[in-house]
Regions:
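Positively charged, amphipathic and often flexible ligand-engagement surfaces
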Residues: 185-187, 199-221
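Catalytic alpha-helical scaffold of carbohydrate-active enzymes acting on polysaccharides/glycoconjugates
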Residues: 2-198, 222-236
Length: 236
């Protein structure tokens, strides 16, 4: 029989057969609020859709819906997070710094952690050659380092897209963790050609775009899903 291709990044491990897991402070559960701050090219490249595109360019409706998030939605959410004293992990396209840097500044001033999220969500990382991808990662790192005064350590790929070399390139670029893989409830060390990088879970079930736009979940049900996920993870 044909041998199936494997990724070779980590071995199989049943969560029921592992030793007890605890964070350095002794806590059993860690929570992060991941807020994606994304910028898209106008009338070219990829983009999330509120409604199916007509195929005619420019697709003003869907572009404007995405831009609403940077102009209005991000500010409404910042006010909510601050009212709840809730820290945020801000997953930032590097092109945001050229478009609306004041949004990043406001979140940074509120105590948000800045996580690299590629250059733009108008392109998929996995479509690049290895040299193109390495150059993109390096460019994003330089842009965030210049803006934040420190090199980013975490990464989420645009569209959660990877090439076969992405973990290797991220490790070589100085990243210590990334969020692309949703294969576990616990952080998992993944092999690269130069060492290890930590995979931090990024659960798709409580991601608003798949839940609300794809599966047509109501806002109330989505909120219940987040609460139920937290309660179940805490119980486990």
């Amino acid at each position: 029989m044909k041998t199936l291709r494997e990724h070779g990044r980590y071995p199989y491990s049943s969560i029921t057969q592992r030793p007890g897991f605890a964070w350095p402070q002794g806590d059993g559960l860690a929570v992060y609020i991941g807020l994606n701050l994304e910028h898209f090219a106008f009338a070219e490249g990829l983009g999330g859709e509120l409604v199916p595109s007509t195929g005619l360019a420019p697709d003003v409706l869907n572009y404007a819906w995405r831009d609403y998030g940077n102009r209005v939605g991000a500010w409404r959410m910042l006010a909510l997070f601050e009212s709840l004293d809730m820290p945020v992990s801000l997953l930032v396209n590097a092109s945001i710094y050229d478009y609306c840097p004041e949004v990043v500044t406001a979140y940074r001033d509120s105590g948000a952690e800045i996580v690299a999220h590629g250059h733009t969500n108008s392109e998929k990382q996995g479509d690049l050659t290895e040299s193109e991808e390495a150059a993109m990662i390096a460019g994003v790192s330089r842009r965030l380092t210049d803006a934040e005064g420190m090199a980013p350590k975490g990464w989420l790929g645009p569209w959660i897209s990877e090439s076969a070399h992405t973990p290797d390139l991220l490790h070589e670029g100085g990243y210590t963790y990334f969020l692309d893989w949703c294969h576990d409830d616990q952080p998992v060390w993944m092999r690269t050609r130069g060492g290890h990088i930590l995979s931090v879970p990024y659960p798709q079930e409580v991601n608003d775009i798949p839940a609300i736009l794809v599966r047509r979940t109501s806002a109330e049900t989505f909120a219940d899903m987040i609460i139920d996920n937290f309660d179940e993870m805490l119980d486990q």
